[in-house]
C-alpha cells in the first residue's frame, strides 16, 4: 500500500477541486460563501461562483461543507 504523502486538508481540497463539487464555506465571522474550488495553496483557496473568482484566506475559514458526499480514499464506500 502506498503511503499518503498529502495531509487531509490538501486531499479534501484537491478532491473537491478535481470533481468540481460545489461547496459552502463558512468564515469565522459568520459569512457564508458558496462555489467551486479552482485552486488552493498553503494560505488561501480560490473559489469560483457565477463567473467570478474569490480569494479566501484559510485563516478566515471555520467550516467547509461539500454539496454531496465525497469519496477521498480508494477503499472507502460512499455513505448510504
Curated annotation (Swiss-Prot):
GO terms for molecular function: RNA binding. Residues 10-70 form the Sm domain. InterPro entries: Hfq (IPR005001), LSM_dom_sf (IPR010920), Sm (IPR047575). Pfam families: Hfq (PF17209). Signal peptide: none annotated. Homohexamer. This is RNA-binding protein Hfq. It comes from Sinorhizobium fredii (strain NBRC 101917 / NGR234).
